[in-house]
Amino acid sequence: MPHIDSMMTPFPHSIEASVTIHDAQAIMASEGIRHLPVTSEGRLVGMISDRDLKLAYALAGSSQSEETLHVGDVCNLEAYITEYNTPVDDVVMHMAEIRVGTAMITRNGKLVGIFTTTDVCRNYAELLKIAYPDA
């Protein structure tokens, strides 16, 4: 079974927990991404998604503006993190079991990649082409 590092997206963008949600949304829009691993003082602490940002904007209302809410205030601190040499099937099954669309991939505690449902679909399509070359 191949390891997750053979199917992940390497060197993902990440964001510091102290950055405003406004800036996080701008980064996601400019890079065309939906997930950002969150770091604090160089340590991986969570994940923020475009869905998290939409919810934060909806709940903030007049109590907090987008300039005062920070990524660390709204990110998922329970994000799925696994090592680069974990078998792909284990990662995909665990993602399905805990119902998440993203896994952050580390090597010796350092972020080296991200694996999303988009990566699952891309790799599945490649396998289908191999299994059914004449289709």
Region locations from a protein language model:
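Tandem CBS (Bateman) regulatory domains
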Residues: 1-11, 49-80, 87-96, 111, ...
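The conserved cystathionine-beta-synthase
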Residues: 14-32, 39, 81-99, 105-106, ...
